[in-house]
């Protein structure tokens, strides 16, 4: 999808801000359909990496980050650590650049507080998503179902594809599946961002956007 396709659409953002020296993800997602069984997900994922660690990360992870940057899959910012002002600027200018309406921003509290305060001050509704299997199991399962049934469309993005290849799921004692960062091979931040935005859309479809967000655990 080109940028023009997004104009006028309501979108939900899923963030994975993680550690400042690690990769960061901003995933933007919308959908078409009336319920979970027929909804089609559309996503645009952007990564951020420390500019001063491109060579080091490329060698260690076996990923050509310079090519990913040239292809528009990620943005290099800062030096040894991520410059979060660039991430915040990206989020805060999405509506103007693409003509979208940001409905909600979903995030993991880890390392996100400062950025989230800026987003809330700008008038955006931000939803903390507990990174626990009891919460993430359902959107993870639904995202997988959408992918396997051809109801997940994404802008061409090799970085996103690499992240999905890296991802490994684990089951908790209740058989709830979730993406386990510790057991995954290399980076999965873009998968986590996708799951967070999928969670918000799942809540929208289940509860009609009445502001009720269910998190158990």
Label each PLM-derived region with a short phrase:
Residues 1-131, 137, 141, 158-217:
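RNase H-like, metal-dependent nuclease domains and their acidic two-metal-ion catalytic environment used
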């Amino acid at each position: 999808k080109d940028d023009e396709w997004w104009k006028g659409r309501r979108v939900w953002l899923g963030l994975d801000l993680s550690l400042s020296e690690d990769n960061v993800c901003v995933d933007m997602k919308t959908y078409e359909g009336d319920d979970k069984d027929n909804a089609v997900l559309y996503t645009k994922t952007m990564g951020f990496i420390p500019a001063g660690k491109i060579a080091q990360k490329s060698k260690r992870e076996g990923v050509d980050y310079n090519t990913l940057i040239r292809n528009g899959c990620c943005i290099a910012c800062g030096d040894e650590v991520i410059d979060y002002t660039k991430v915040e600027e990206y989020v805060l200018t999405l509506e103007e650049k693409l003509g979208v309406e940001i409905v909600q921003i979903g995030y993991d509290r880890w390392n996100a507080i400062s950025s989230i305060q800026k987003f809330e001050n700008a008038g955006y509704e931000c939803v903390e998503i507990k990174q626990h299997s009891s919460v993430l199991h359902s959107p993870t399962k639904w995202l997988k179902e959408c992918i396997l049934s051809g109801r997940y469309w994404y802008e061409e993005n090799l970085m996103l594809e690499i992240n999905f290849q890296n991802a490994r799921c684990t089951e908790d004692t209740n058989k709830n599946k979730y993406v386990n960062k510790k057991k995954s091979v290399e980076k999965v931040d873009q998968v986590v961002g996708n799951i967070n935005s999928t969670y918000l859309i799942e809540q929208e479809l289940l509860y009609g956007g009445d502001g009720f967000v269910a998190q158990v655990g």
